[in-house]
Amino acid sequence: MKTLLLTFLVVTIVCLDLGYTLICHQVHGLQTCEPAQKFCQKRTTMFFPNHPVLLMGCTYNCPTERYSVCCSTDKCNK
């Protein structure tokens, strides 16, 4: 009986997703998101005319800009 309970406990712990955080691509490497950051983003913006800048990483909400991608799975913003 103890073996059965121990097995059940181990399976329960393995199946639970304790402390899961999202992983997103940045321009250089990967970023582990804060628990409240539920989305990865990839967007192109222009700070100066004819000079596009690529922004990638974790975000709290999805950008609504025209040239942006938002997703919610690990490494989905490549």
UniProtKB/Swiss-Prot annotation:
Coiled coil: none annotated. Keywords: Acetylcholine receptor inhibiting toxin, Disulfide bond, Ion channel impairing toxin, Neurotoxin, Postsynaptic neurotoxin, Secreted, Signal, Toxin. GO terms for cellular component: extracellular region. The record marks 45, 47 as: Important residue for inhibition of muscle alpha-1-beta-1-delta-epsilon (CHRNA1-CHRNB1-CHRND-CHRNE) nAChR. Disulfide bonds join 24-40, 33-58, 62-70, 71-76. Its main location: secreted. The record marks 46 as: Key residue for inhibition of muscle alpha-1-beta-1-delta-epsilon (CHRNA1-CHRNB1-CHRND-CHRNE) and important for inhibition of neuronal alpha-3-beta-2/CHRNA3-CHRNB2 nAChR. InterPro entries: Snake_3FTx, Snake_toxin-like_sf, Toxin_cobra-type. The record marks 48 as: Key residue for inhibition of muscle alpha-1-beta-1-delta-epsilon (CHRNA1-CHRNB1-CHRND-CHRNE) and important residue for inhibition of neuronal alpha-3-beta-2/CHRNA3-CHRNB2 nAChR. The record marks 28, 43, 51, 66 as: Important residue for inhibition of muscle alpha-1-beta-1-delta-epsilon (CHRNA1-CHRNB1-CHRND-CHRNE) and neuronal alpha-3-beta-2/CHRNA3-CHRNB2 nAChR. The keyword Signal applies. Expressed by the venom gland. GO terms for molecular function: acetylcholine receptor inhibitor activity; ion channel regulator activity; toxin activity. The record marks 44 as: Key residue for inhibition of muscle alpha-1-beta-1-delta-epsilon (CHRNA1-CHRNB1-CHRND-CHRNE) nAChR. Pfam families: Toxin_cobra-type. It is found in: Secreted. Residues 1-21 form the signal peptide. The record marks 67 as: Important residue for interaction with muscle alpha-1-beta-1-delta-epsilon (CHRNA1-CHRNB1-CHRND-CHRNE) and neuronal alpha-3-beta-2/CHRNA3-CHRNB2 nAChR. It comes from the Eukaryota. This three-finger toxin binds and inhibits the nicotinic acetylcholine receptor (nAChR). Belongs to the three-finger toxin family. Short-chain subfamily. This is Short neurotoxin SNTX26. It comes from Ophiophagus hannah.
